[in-house]
Curated annotation (Swiss-Prot):
Gene Ontology BP annotations: one-carbon metabolic process; S-adenosylmethionine biosynthetic process
GO MF terms held by the record: ATP binding; magnesium ion binding; methionine adenosyltransferase activity
Cofactor(s) essential for the protein: Mg(2+); K(+)
Organism from which the protein derives: Burkholderia vietnamiensis (strain G4 / LMG 22486)
Gene Ontology cellular-component annotations: cytoplasm
Pathway annotation: Amino-acid biosynthesis; S-adenosyl-L-methionine biosynthesis; S-adenosyl-L-methionine from L-methionine: step 1/1
The name this protein goes by in its record: S-adenosylmethionine synthase
Record-listed Mg(2+) binding positions: D18
Record lineage: Bacteria, Pseudomonadati, Pseudomonadota, Betaproteobacteria, Burkholderiales
Keywords: ATP-binding, Cytoplasm, Magnesium, Metal-binding, Nucleotide-binding, One-carbon metabolism, Potassium, Transferase
Residue positions binding K(+): E44
Localization (cell): Cytoplasm
Residues that hold ATP according to the record: H16, D167, A168, K169, R233, F234, D242, R248, K249, A265, K269
Length: 395
């Protein structure tokens, strides 16, 4: 990639239909883990006009009112009126869960003891990434995209813009010079709205109240292209506008396209599923590498075979920004991080009901107390082992 270029990422709000599905799936996972932390959960959700379907595989001793959890989640998001196309009180909720296949369970059922050789729940490859573009060590385009839809939700909830509705999407294009963010080129924000708001008033309010307060002043250079509801009317949205499915926003959930993705979604999956836990571990590793000052960008790939504890591969790429070689960093990763599935669960304390909060506005780059994978507690040890000075972002 050239050093001067434009890069774009997008995000969606908690009221986007796919995110409604993700949040229901993770709310169900949390409710199960609260009662039985060794449960096996793969909770999938479909939501359409007036309909929610819960399906997947769940093996647990927990006694859960799945229908009520789905309704409560829809209510929290803000779909509390039949005019919105789905209403938590009146929507139909269908439940069709099976138990986990015994053929899969045999490789992961040693989770109750202290043996760290629990096998991976599936084969696959996962990536983690960090860079020094923001204090959170995230790529700037996805970081700003998340903050825009977060602010849309905040102004909707507190009534400052009462005509806002739950569904929204954002997109940010950043100009890079010498490989670093230089300026904001384009901001797109589409928001669902009440039918009586005029488009010019909507556009002015969105630009002045949502977009401008979110953008860093040092990146505003020249005229930014603001595209607000570029098709015009956006009254029909949420699950009425599009069918929502768990796991369809995997790039929004991670790095906005700035890093590869192994293809496995996160929401609704207990941490024995390496699609989720190993991706969290990858972020933890990459963030500590950058926080340690070993590199300004770090990409981690880890892969697994079903029923096998040790990763089949671990790869580190610092894109030429490393202060020591990638081979040295890879060796340090293997020494300082236990990337076996049970080791990850223990290292990041993942058998907790912490997942609903991850299901909107990104799983990474948020300083939430439950997000153990955002800690930089390994950075000092990595820096000392590599013989470099850590950055100021060690926490």
């Amino acid at each position: 990639m050239a050093n001067d270029y434009f890069f774009t990422s997008e995000s969606v709000s908690e009221g986007h239909p796919d995110k409604v599905a993700d949040q229901i799936s993770d709310a169900i996972l949390d409710a199960i883990l609260e009662q039985d932390k060794y449960s096996r959960v793969a909770a999938e959700t479909l939501c359409n006009t007036g309909l929610v379907v819960l399906a997947g595989e769940i093996t647990t001793t927990a006694n859960i009112d799945y229908i009520q959890i789905a309704r409560d989640t829809i209510k929290r998001i803000g779909y509390d009126n039949t005019d919105y196309g789905i209403d938590y009180k009146g929507c139909a909720v269908l439940v069709a869960y099976d138990k986990q296949s015994p053929d899969i369970a045999q490789g992961v059922d040693r989770a109750h003891d202290d043996n760290l050789d629990q096998g991976a729940g599936d084969q696959g490859l996962m990536f983690g990434y960090a860079c020094d573009e923001t204090p959170e060590l995230m790529p700037l385009p996805i970081y700003l995209s998340h903050r825009l839809v977060e602010r849309q939700a905040s102004l909707r909830r507190d009534g400052r813009l009462p005509w806002l509705r739950p569904d929204a999407k954002s997109q940010v294009t950043i100009r890079y010079v010498d490989g670093k963010p230089d300026s904001i080129d384009t901001v797109v924000l589409s928001t669902q709205h009440a039918p009586d708001i005029e488009l010019p008033a909507l556009r002015e309010a969105v630009i002045e109240e949502i977009i401008k307060p979110t953008l860093p002043a040092d990146l505003i250079k020249g005229d930014i292209k603001f595209l607000v509801n570029p098709t015009g009317r956006f009254v029909i949205g949420g699950p009425q506008g599009d069918c929502g499915l768990t796991g369809r926003k995997i790039i929004v959930d991670t790095y906005g396209g700035a890093a590869p993705h192994g293809g496995g979604a996160f929401s609704g999956k207990d941490p024995s599923k390496v699609d989720r836990s190993a991706a969290y571990a990858g972020r933890y590793v990459a963030k500590n590498i950058v926080a340690a000052g070993l590199a300004s960008r770090a990409l981690i790939q880890v892969s697994y075979a079903i029923g096998v504890a040790e990763p089949t591969s671990v790869m580190v790429n610092t894109f030429g920004t490393g202060r020591v070689s990638d081979a040295v960093i890879t060796k340090l990763v293997r020494e300082h991080f236990d990337l076996r599935p049970k080791g990850i669960i223990k290292m990041l304390d993942l058998l907790r009901p912490i997942y609903e909060k991850t299901a909107a506005y990104g799983h990474f780059g948020r300083e939430e107390p439950e997000f153990s994978w955002e800690a930089t507690d390994k950075a000092l040890a990595l820096a000392e082992a590599a013989g470099v000075e850590p950055t100021a972002r060690v926490a």
